[in-house]
């Protein structure tokens, strides 16, 4: 698995080295730069070039790290319990998978894009450290552990709107 660019995306030698090092060493690739410089498109082109599925997680200022893992809908469960709905007996009916969960259980090794990570609050990157390192996470409501079948190729973009934590940066290749 090597990325050499595509007909639609001409990559510099430095970028090719960074992408291939991140893939080979199974570490996230952090791509920093101004808006509109092709950072997001890079993940799409890596997926195309490697014939891999692309899973996109577009981060907003209100995004929390847990949303990338899963979301538990306690309000719907409470409402259903008051209405006597049978679904309430299985808490799994109220858990929605996040983008990391989708990437962890994908049949083929996917490219996971975490787009514009610097839009979220300062703790967001640190909140993902363990999950990205260990490639697993715990679902508190069910007591289950979700483990990655295979480590996804992780591409993280940043517009340099704010500094990212050092502990997070140490775990990434960057370009």
Model feature map: region roles:
Residues 94-95, 101-109, 139-157:
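AAA+/SF3 P-loop NTPase mechanochemical coupling elements
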Residues 69-107:
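Short glycine-rich substrate-engagement loop in P-loop NTPases that contacts/grips substrate
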Residues 29-75:
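Walker A/P-loop
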Residues 117, 134-150, 161-167:
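Conserved Walker
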Residues 52-56, 165-175:
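A short helix-turn-beta junction within AAA+ P-loop NTPase domains corresponding to the substrate/partner-engaging
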Residues 97-132, 163-164:
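Conserved AAA+/SF3 P-loop NTPase catalytic/coupling segment centered on the Walker-B
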Residues 11-13, 20-26, 34, 103-107:
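Phosphate-binding P-loop
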């Amino acid at each position: 698995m090597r990325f050499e660019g595509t007909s639609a995306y001409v990559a510099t030698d430095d970028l090719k080295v960074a992408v291939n090092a991140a893939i080979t060493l199974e570490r996230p690739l952090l791509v920093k730069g101004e808006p509109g410089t092709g950072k997001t498109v890079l993940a799409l082109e890596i997926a195309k070039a490697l014939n891999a599925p692309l899973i996109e997680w577009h981060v907003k200022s209100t995004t929390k790290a847990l949303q990338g893992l899963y979301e538990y809908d306690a309000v719907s469960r409470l409402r259903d319990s008051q209405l006597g709905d049978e679904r309430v007996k299985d808490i799994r009916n109220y858990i929605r998978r996040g983008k990391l969960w989708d990437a962890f259980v994908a049949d083929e090794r996917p490219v996971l894009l975490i787009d514009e990570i610097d839009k979220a609050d300062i703790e967001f990157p640190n909140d993902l450290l363990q999950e990205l390192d260990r490639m697993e996470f715990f679902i508190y409501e069910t007591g289950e552990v979700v483990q990655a079948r295979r480590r996804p190729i992780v591409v993280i973009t940043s517009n340099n709107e704010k500094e990212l934590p050092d502990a997070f940066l140490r775990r990434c290749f960057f370009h």
